[in-house]
Amino acid sequence: MLGKEDGANSIGKSSAMLAIDFVFGGDTYLKSDGVKHIRHHTIFFAFQFCGQKYCFARATEDADNAFLCKENHDLMGPYRMKDEFVNWLKVQYHMDFDGLSFRIALSSFFRIYSKDNTDERRPLRGIPRKDMEKSIALLVALFDRNKDIQV
């Protein structure tokens, strides 16, 4: 998502990206302007895997859970604990790599203004305040190349 180069239009790009991160199990959105201004709310979203659509809801006031719902947004339960939901996503996206959590793999490369990982001089540094070695190890694991490295 890109805005104008001069940054003149603040159209909520960061809030939208934080909401997307929230859908994937992140929590930074809970402290965002979106929640501060419109208070607690529920985000409804869907994923499609192998031709099957899965609809969910995640509420800011109950962020530890993700609820299964119908396409019309009716909650149908059962709910999943956030960690269980994130693990389900990891399996669906085939991202079960040694030494790499799904959340770290995903959120490390979301470049969102308020997430403190927007260092344009070090674009491979996916983990703020960590050395480049950890960021490179993350990329190696993300591309499932650990087995190719000889020690």
Predicted regions: what they are:
Residues 45-46, 52-68:
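Gly/Lys-enriched N-terminal cap/neck module of very large, oligomeric protein machines
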Residues 11-19, 38-42, 134:
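Short, well-structured alpha-helical interface segments that form or flank functional binding sites
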Residues 5, 52, 146-147:
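A generic structural motif
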Residues 61-64, 69-150:
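Extended, charged alpha-helical "arm/stalk" segments used for dimerization and assembly
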Residues 1-31:
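Phosphate-binding glycine-rich loops of NTP-binding sites
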Residues 28-43:
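Flexible phosphate/Mg2+-sensing switch loops adjacent to catalytic phosphate-binding sites
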Residues 35-37, 46-48, 58-59, 128-133:
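A general structural signal for short secondary-structure junctions and capping/turn motifs
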